[in-house]
Every structure is written in structure tokens, then in C-alpha cells.
Amino acid sequence: MDKLIIVGGVPLNGSIRISGAKNAVLPILAATLLIEEPVILSNIPHLNDVTTMIELLGRMGAQITIDERMSIEVDCSQIQNVHASYELVKTMRASILVLGPLLSRFGKAEVSLPGGCAIGSRPVDVHIDGMRALGADIELVDGFIHATVEGRLKGAELNLGKITVTGTENLIMAATLAEGQTIIHNAACEPEVQDLANFLNKMGARISGAGTDTIVIDGVDRLSGGSYSILPDRIEAGTYLVAAAMTRGHVRIRDVFPKTLGAVLEKLHEAGARVKIGENWVDLDMQGRRAKAVDIVTAPYPEMPTDMQAQFMALNVVAEGQAVITETVFENRFMHVHELQRMGADIKLQGSKALIRGKEKLTGAPVMATDLRASAGLVLAGLMARGNTIVDRIYHIDRGYECIEEKLAQLGAEIRRVSSHVYAARYAAQKRWL
């Protein structure tokens, strides 16, 4: 198991390119199951979750070709089975996204209940209730969702009980080949939902309203193949901007959609950053100043994403002043707090709130990642800690960040990846000399 070793205290400076969005490419890969012709996808991030989704499609019979630029051709014309095994689904919650397209195109699906990050209850009730409203028969048997439909799914008016990104995406895909019109109320508005709709529309779907809380899908008989480029990852972009702010640096991120970063940029400006925006870039300069503490309340888009909560917590623990972070999207998403406290952070938890008093510096320590975004927060904290910070269980971070140590090193950070057996050997050697 790999670890990251970080020597803190270096301001980040320079320019990096932002990768394609993990939360956009996964539903779009699942959506290729709706299409009988080859699809070429570009701007694909090299991530463990993407590899898992590709393997899942491959086991179903999809023919997949990857070139040296990480463009992917997916041909789902010869799908042989509609079974998504527990072995793969347990590692990634987004695997549930194959349910809608399998059911819509093939009239049946067997999908294991998902796994993924341990950050609270994220039930699939919205997915199942929506599929049933579209005419599917669904049973839960031995940890699997067994879904069937006679003929085609039928369009319906759906009122989602809670805002859910994957639930909205799954129901969009299910409705794309359904008979008649489907209207989704209380739909998620995230840019990744819009990207899925844009992709499907380019392949021949008839979807309107994506980006609002009411999405209308007029079902079509079939989709055609084509090519599509995945939108940039706003969470990766936000992570590097926060890293620059908390290290008092000056960083430009390229190949981004600044309009998707509104809430993040607003808080970074409030923290004292000078922010400039271009068509596809953002420039952040702290001019050597310490960041000011900022209150954060997570909420669905266009408000502050819950996936940026841990990063802003890392900023606040070394910022000037006090801040309150309120988590409204997921329960149990403060598991990184105890690890930050090991580094000297002054954080007190009160239910869904974290009360933070900023310190000038943290102290490096061994810490353990508990989920994808928590691991990013710990890496950022390590950038401002005295001495060495060792982040363990970084397989979490590899699920959502492409080459994070290389990009941070490109900006001047002292960071390296080592395998556990190499680290253990070095630690043992050091002890012999003590």
C-alpha cells in the first residue's frame, strides 16, 4: 500500500493543467451502454474509479480501446450480460449508474448494491423508486438489485424525495430510451449532470432543462455513436486553488470552466486571495499573505460542494481567525477531523458543525485517509505542517486525483510517493541509527 510523504512549508507557485472530471466521466461511461455504435471519449482522467468502470463494462461484453492520450473508444454493440458483480461494485458507489442504461436498453439488469467511500448513508431508494415509476419490476435479492421490464420503460413524472446527483443521472439514462416523456422534479443541477445530458443529446437524445431542478426527457428509439470531450474537474481545480491559498502561493490552473467554480472562488476571495479569471483559466495569488478564516456551508450546486469541505477545513486550520464549517449534505463526513487534530489543528465538533480556530502552523504526523476528499484535505494540511507528514491509505486519493503528487511537485511542493515496504525498510534503518 502506497503512502505520500510531504515536507511542509513551501508556498505553491506555477501553473498546472486540470484533468477531466471523475464525476462526469463515470456516468458518461455508463451511458455508453445505451448506444449500439462506438463512442470515443477524450479528456479522460487516469483514475482508479475510471479503471473500475472500464473493467465493469468490459466484463459485460463492451469492446474498449485506450490510446496513449487516454482517449477511450467504447463499443457496446455486443453486450453479453447485464450482471454487475459485487467484486467490482463494492469498490465504487458510481457502479450503480449502470442500472438505468441496462434496464432501458436490454429490459433487465442485475446490479450489486454499491460500496465506495464510507461517509455516511447514501441509499439507492431514489434510484429504485424512480425505476419502478417508469414501469420496472425490482426486487432486492442477496444484496443485488434485480430489475426487469416488459417491453420499454414508460415515461412518467418523477418527484425526487431528495436531491441526488447519481439518482438524477440514473433516471435520465433510464428515460432516454423510454416510451414517451419523463419529467424529473427536484433534479440535481450539478455541472456533471449537465455534461451527461450534453453527451446524450449529442448522441441523439432529447433532454432539456439539465442544470435546473426540472429536467424533461423525451424518449427516443435509439442513439448513435460519436465523440465527446469530458468537462474539467471542478473539485480538482478547487483543491489546487485552496492549496495555493493556504500556502500563501501564486498558482494558475488551466483547462477549467471557471463558471463551475463560483462558490469556491467567492470563498477564496473572502479568504484574501487575488483571483483573476480567463476563458479557461483561473489565476490565484495570495501575495505572500496568510489566508483569512472563512465560514463554509455545504449544499447542492451552485452552493459550496460537499466534496470541497475537507479542503476548506485544511485551509481554516492554518488561517487567521475562527471559522465554522457546516455539513448539510452527508452525515459522518468529519472523519478527517481526528487526523487533523493529530497534526495540532484546533477543531471542535458540534453535530453537523466544526468550529475551527486557526493556527500559524501545524506539526507533521502520520495520518490515515478515510475517504477520497478527506485524503485531499490531509495532503493539503501536510503542505503547511512543520516536518514530515505521512499520509497512509492513499488508494482513496487515487480514486479521484490524477497524479496528485506530480502536480503538487510541479508547483514546488516537497512530496513523494513510496510503497509501504520501502517506507518500512527506511523506518527500520533509521531506528537502528537512533
UniProtKB/Swiss-Prot annotation:
Q: In which pathway is this protein known to take part?
A: Cell wall biogenesis; peptidoglycan biosynthesis
Q: Which residues carry this modification: 2-(S-cysteinyl)pyruvic acid O-phosphothioketal?
A: C117
Superkingdom of the source species: Bacteria
Q: Which GO terms describe its cellular component?
A: cytoplasm
Localization of this protein: Cytoplasm
Single GO biological process annotation from the record: regulation of cell shape
Q: Where does phosphoenolpyruvate bind?
A: K22, N23
Q: Active site at which residues?
A: C117
Q: Where does UDP-N-acetyl-alpha-D-glucosamine bind?
A: R93, D307, V329
Sorted alphabetically, the keyword list is:
Cell cycle, Cell division, Cell shape, Cell wall biogenesis/degradation, Cytoplasm, Peptidoglycan synthesis, Pyruvate, Transferase
Keyword Zinc annotated: no
Task: Output one GO MF annotation.
Answer: UDP-N-acetylglucosamine 1-carboxyvinyltransferase activity
Q: Which InterPro entries match?
A: Enolpyruvate_Tfrase_dom (IPR001986), Enolpyruvate_Tfrase_sf (IPR036968), MurA_subfamily (IPR050068), RNA3'P_cycl/enolpyr_Trfase_a/b (IPR013792), UDP_GlcNAc_COvinyl_MurA (IPR005750)
Q: What are the EC numbers?
A: 2.5.1.7
Top EC class, one word: transferase
Q: Which reaction equations make up its catalytic activity?
A: phosphoenolpyruvate + UDP-N-acetyl-alpha-D-glucosamine = UDP-N-acetyl-3-O-(1-carboxyvinyl)-alpha-D-glucosamine + phosphate
What is this protein's function? Cell wall formation. Adds enolpyruvyl to UDP-N-acetylglucosamine.
Alphabetized HAMAP family for the sequence: MurA
NCBIfam families assigned to the protein according to its UniProt record, in alphabetical order: murA, PRK09369.1
Name the family the entry cites. Answer: Belongs to the EPSP synthase family. MurA subfamily.
Output this protein's name: UDP-N-acetylglucosamine 1-carboxyvinyltransferase
